[in-house]
Amino acid sequence: MTETVTTTSSDKSEKKNYLFYTSPNHRPPTVVRAEGVYLYLEDGTRIMDATGGAAVACLGHGNKEVIDAMHKQSEKVCYIHSMGFSNEPADKLANLLVSEHPDVFARAYFANSGSEAVETCLKLILQYWQLVGEKQRCHIIARKQGYHGNTLFALSVGGMKPRKQPYEGVFSHTTSHVSPCFEYRYKENGETTEEYVARLAKELEDEILRVGPEKVAAFVAETVSGACTGCATPVPGYFKAMRKVCDKYGVIFYLDEVMSGIGRTGTMHAWEQEGVTPDIQSIAKCLGGGYQPISGALVGHRIMNVFEQKDAAMAGFFTYQAHPIACSAALAVQTILRRDHLVERAAEMGKYLSEKLHETFDSHPNVGNIRGRGLFWGLEIVKDKATKECFPPEYKVGSLANKIGCEHGVFVYPGMGTIDGTRGDHVLLAPPYIITREQIDELVEALSKTITSTVAALP
């Protein structure tokens, strides 16, 4: 929003924007309307939202059924404090999510962002160990190049170095990191998939033994990696091996599906394709589809049984947790996903997107790798395809691709730190599940122009 202000140092009036933008010295374009898979700017420019924002808008923009559900709820109850009351949309949403996997989950807890969902899961894990009399179990093992959110605890378990750097001095010292499952970058030449999995499993076990099994609370991983490694998918057997190591030492197995969950990879939960189940899981983005800020923790029986036996509440609340309007929006989104078979559609359209990406970019000299599942895809941009050499980090290739993409009519999610948290670049695609084949053709054509123009613009 702009307004005319009068400064104290001058009688002259000037227009000033007071919003703290992503870059304080650059005002991004303003979206004045959004419909389906498209965004419309002030000047009438139409841009395809090829990432659903930040892998959020699974239903696309402007779904009237969701908007009507929010309006209807706003006429009943807009806000109550969940410390003292419940509300109908929250109860219905929890019942829907948990009842689909009653053998896996016991309860659902709703917060406001992916970061809050991760914080909630981590806090519940630590409180669980206190309740069972093992309060020394407070060490979290995560993965390098993981990204779990922007709050301090979530950042401390993550591996995106540029976002962590300003706060290094206050991070928890009870976190450590093992290698991610990142076949393109870290599977060795001549190494079989089974050998690669065994090596990663041994690394996790060695880290548990180094810390001390009696001190390790949980292992946390993104089922399909998101912002940092750009949709790096696990190789077959990886998560089964990780789960086996965790079970051996009694370590909580926590899967973060803030970005990859709720249908994004072609199944409701990404872990359904891995043959494992989590002890606890975080969800967010496609839970509410961007219509309201909402996230959740799906709590398994191992943890919930102890809370029930001890009659223990979670040690802390969020003011807006289980917000009635947010839950009504999410309930509408989840109802539509199931009724209209949109998760299955994400799998179907994902196959077509995969075909088009490989057809277009397999021979591109600056696309080193194409990876993903469902409607969740990453393209790693490299300087040399044969050697996998990346561009220097200071080139900010992902950000440049994002900017140039908008000039070609497509918004792509920029990625950096792909290789080690600092080096490496990718762009991420996560279009709405309602995208059509014709729109996928449009997306890939614009992306081809974007990547070619981006590389041409580099020093």
Swiss-Prot record:
Transmembrane parts of this sequence: none
Signal peptide residue numbers: none
Gene3D superfamilies for the chain: Aspartate Aminotransferase, domain 1, Type I PLP-dependent aspartate aminotransferase-like (Major domain)
InterPro entries: Aminotrans_3 (IPR005814), PyrdxlP-dep_Trfase (IPR015424), PyrdxlP-dep_Trfase_major (IPR015421), PyrdxlP-dep_Trfase_small (IPR015422)
One Pfam family linked to the record: Aminotran_3
Keywords linked to the UniProt accession: Aminotransferase, Cytoplasm, Pyridoxal phosphate, Transferase
Localisation: Cytoplasm
GO molecular function terms noted in the UniProt entry: pyridoxal phosphate binding; transaminase activity
Keyword Cytoplasm on entry: yes
Main location: cytoplasm
Uppermost EC category: transferase
EC nos: 2.6.-.-
GO annotation, cellular component aspect: cytosol
Entry similarity comment: Belongs to the class-III pyridoxal-phosphate-dependent aminotransferase family.
PANTHER family reported in the protein's UniProt record: AMINOTRANSFERASE (PTHR43094), AMINOTRANSFERASE CLASS-III (PTHR43094:SF1)
NCBIfam families in the record: PRK07483.1 (NF005685)
Protein name, per record: Uncharacterized aminotransferase C1771.03c
Organism: Schizosaccharomyces pombe (strain 972 / ATCC 24843)
